[in-house]
């Protein structure tokens, strides 16, 4: 709070990008939207030192948790100006179009190399939802106007559900593009899932669904070691994105722990505990510094085990223990303590002692009796709510401190019924809840009826009732990826050289492939301050001046009479001099799309292509090729990173774990030498996950066609922001 800027009004309008750093990030100048009142500087008690991270969101979230635990309204009153300045600053900078969805500017651990180009981002928006919702509560408690904060929180939640929640997929998008086609990026990192749950934007169904996305799509890496019994332990990577860049796809202890917390918050206690235990075994038991919290895991393919005594995992591990496993959730500003234990279903007993709370749990072997004992020492708390899972279909008897008491069912309980008891409980008072169970064990649904919840999602929920208990039972319903066609791998197993005929497309060439990173891509760009791709079309805000020299000398020297004869038996027409690529892009430098006439009939089209992509354009269609026939129909092949669209400067690192393309390795043509291989990664001896190729490489693709139809033309269109997609040659197999 003492590092917050208070005397620097915003006098310089959006956008305020740093021209010396290739427009990738905000210029460090007082008076810009970012470096003005409300901004929290990095160093303690210094509000005159700029830095490049948005530390505001994390600090304010910690402050609000402090108030949740203490209920200290006098301190809340002192901090009120800090909170309101922060919220105004976030709105000015990251929701300048006032749509309720916020850009993210280096505001989480995985900030390095993340950039959203003024997009609508789930994790930062979730942070702002919680901050506004609790600001409204604080305002009510201290006599300030709560209306603006209620309205903003409602607006945010409505926008999140309308635009970023994907019901057919059962999770939020990583972000929605502000520029271009305003598409959703549908493969979020774990930070999207855990921040959403941590900031309370999810209902119980959404919480379960979102964590099941982690089960299905986030890479799981087995945790094994000498002397460790193999019980299915596994840690996770933060994303499934390629190519590698620091903080984009890592195995980081804090990220794993926070995801474990999300499982507990979703009520998936066994899964949460398994992930928590896996991470502890990985770092604190099998690691090189036993009992220590490091930053990066041994299982991280890029960095390996590194850093000691790291604050991020220490803090999050504390939260997953207290708030997740033991479910201690103070709401002290409302004089309330919620205890919602996340204990594994196999545990028969557990206890916890901290300066704030004592907790005890006992369960009989036959699930006939359960008891919970809670004593808190939170001065502001007057009421205790205990939520716990039912063990059988009836409650025969429930007492609190020996006296009969009432209970209620928790609405939207998933997997098993949850019960709630509420009792007055001031600091130091022991509350002993004793339950004797009756009835029967719980059954599973025999079939999936029509009246399920979230029927379109990969998991649906069946309403269940058994005696006194009601709950929802999750049923997996795997579905194909929505709105994404299957991309057939290019294996080149059906090449017939004698039937191959190169297409003459010389008049469509508009550049040389070597120009791709020598250009300046200046428009269109966001009208707001943001993190974005540097003007040379490669790099990111941490490496804004990075570039790669694309060198096609080997390709050109291999051309004979305008033809490149390849080892695959495919001849490609390409010039030895002059322009040799037809680029398309959403940048104004090149057309969004182009058309190339075709003639006759063909069974396949072989394509020599080259262009750019990056981790922010992973698992989304970067472009599309449409081959039209004379009858007006067309065949379509999407160009998707990493399936069949690689960055010109990179060879994908693949390990079958965190870096897994789930498709055969691509054939690449090394531009500097003219060599073709689908194994350059090993042949050239790259030492790690970063495989930047000297001179760059084109990619060879094949597209099956209908041999019975006459061809009309081919259209290449770029769909993604950031990227440039180039067609260098087409060969038809008649």
Protein language model annotation of sequence segments:
Residues 1-100, 121-129, 186, 190, ...:
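Aromatic-rich carbohydrate-recognition surfaces in CAZymes
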Residues 1, 20-51, 88, 92-120, ...:
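Extended glycan-interaction surfaces of carbohydrate-active proteins
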Residues 15-31, 73-91, 131, 135-163, ...:
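Extended, well-ordered alpha-helical scaffold segments
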Residues 72, 399-404, 630-631:
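Short strand-turn-strand beta-turns centered on an Asx-Gly dipeptide
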Residues 1-16, 456-488:
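Conserved, compact domain cores that house catalytic/ligand-binding motifs in diverse enzymes
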Residues 480-734:
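N-terminal/edge-of-domain interface segments
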Residues 64, 136, 194-197, 260:
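Conserved small-residue packing positions in alpha-helical repeats and bundles
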Residues 258-462:
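Non-catalytic C-terminal accessory modules of carbohydrate-active enzymes
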């Amino acid at each position: 709070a003492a590092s917050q800027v208070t005397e620097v009004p915003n006098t310089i309008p959006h956008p305020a990008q740093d021209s010396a750093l290739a427009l990738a990030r905000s210029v460090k100048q007082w008076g810009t939207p970012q470096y003005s009142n409300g901004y929290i500087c990095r160093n303690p008690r210094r509000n005159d030192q700029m830095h490049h991270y948005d530390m505001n969101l994390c600090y304010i979230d910690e402050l609000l948790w402090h108030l949740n635990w203490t209920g200290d309204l006098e301190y809340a009153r002192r901090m009120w100006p800090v909170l309101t300045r922060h919220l105004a600053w976030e709105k000015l900078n990251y929701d300048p179009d006032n749509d309720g969805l916020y850009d993210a500017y280096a505001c989480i651990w995985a900030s390095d190399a993340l950039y959203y180009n003024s997009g609508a981002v789930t994790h930062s928006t979730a942070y702002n939802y919680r901050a506004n919702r609790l600001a409204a509560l604080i305002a009510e408690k201290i006599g300030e106007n709560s209306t603006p904060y209620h309205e903003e929180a409602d607006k945010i939640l409505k926008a999140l559900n309308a635009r970023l929640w994907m019901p057919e997929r059962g999770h939020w998008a990583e972000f929605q593009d502000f520029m271009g086609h305003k598409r959703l990026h549908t493969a979020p990192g774990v930070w999207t899932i855990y921040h959403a749950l941590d900031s309370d934007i999810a209902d119980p169904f959404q919480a379960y669904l979102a964590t099941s996305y982690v089960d299905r799509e986030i890479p799981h890496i087995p945790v094994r070691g000498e002397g460790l019994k193999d019980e299915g332990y596994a840690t996770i990577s933060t994303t499934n994105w390629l190519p590698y860049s620091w903080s984009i796809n890592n195995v980081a202890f804090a990220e794993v722990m926070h995801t474990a917390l999300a499982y507990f918050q979703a009520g998936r206690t066994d899964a949460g505990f398994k992930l928590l235990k896996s991470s502890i075994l990985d770092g604190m038991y099998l690691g090189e510094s036993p009992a220590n919290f490091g930053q990066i895991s041994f299982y991280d393919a890029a960095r390996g085990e590194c850093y000691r005594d790291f604050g991020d995992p220490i803090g999050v591990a504390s939260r997953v223990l207290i708030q997740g496993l033991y479910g201690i959730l103070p709401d002290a500003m409302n004089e309330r303590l919620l205890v919602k234990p996340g204990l594994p279903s196999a545990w028969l007993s557990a206890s916890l002692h901290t300066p704030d709370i004592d907790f005890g749990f006992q369960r009989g072997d036959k699930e006939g009796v359960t008891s919970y004992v809670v004593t808190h020492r939170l001065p502001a708390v007057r009421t205790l709510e205990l939520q716990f899972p039912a063990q059988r279909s009836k409650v025969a008897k429930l007492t609190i401190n020996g006296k009969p008491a009432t209970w209620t069912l928790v609405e939207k309980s998933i997997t098993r019924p949850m019960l709630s008891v509420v009792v007055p409980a001031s600091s130091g008072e022991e509350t002993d809840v004793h339950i004797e169970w009756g009835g029967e064990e719980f059954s599973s649904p025999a079939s999936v009826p029509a009246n399920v919840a979230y029927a379109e999602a990969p998991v649906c929920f069946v309403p269940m009732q058994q005696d006194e208990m009601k709950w929802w039972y999750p049923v997996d319903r795997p579905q194909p990826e929505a709105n994404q066609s299957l991309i057939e791998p290019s294996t080149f197993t059906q090449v017939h050289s004698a039937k191959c005929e190169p297409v003459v497309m010389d008049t469509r060439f508009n550049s040389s492939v070597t120009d791709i990173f020598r250009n300046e891509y200046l428009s269109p760009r966001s009208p707001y301050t943001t993190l974005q791709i540097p003007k040379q079309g490669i790099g990111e805000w941490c490496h804004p001046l990075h570039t790669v020299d694309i060198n096609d000398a080997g390709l050109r020297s291999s051309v004979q009479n305008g033809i490149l004869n390849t080892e695959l038996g495919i001849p490609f027409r390409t010039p030895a001099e002059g322009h040799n690529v037809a680029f398309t892009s959403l940048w104004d430098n090149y057309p969004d799309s182009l058309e190339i006439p075709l003639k006759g009939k063909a069974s396949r089209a072989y394509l020599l292509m080259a262009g750019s992509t990056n981790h922010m354009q992973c698992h989304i269609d970067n472009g599309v090729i449409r081959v039209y026939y004379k009858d007006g129909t067309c065949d379509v092949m999407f160009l998707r990173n990493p399936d069949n669209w690689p960055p010109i400067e990179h060879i994908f690192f693949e390990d079958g774990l965190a870096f897994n393309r789930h498709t055969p390795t691509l054939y690449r043509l090394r531009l500097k030498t003219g060599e073709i291989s689908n194994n350059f990664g090993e042949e050239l001896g790259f030492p790690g996950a970063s495989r930047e190729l000297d001179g760059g490489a084109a990619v060879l693709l094949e597209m099956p066609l209908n041999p019975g139809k006459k061809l009309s033309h081919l259209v290449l269109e770029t769909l993604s922001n950031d990227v440039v997609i180039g067609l260098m040659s087409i060969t038809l197999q008649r």
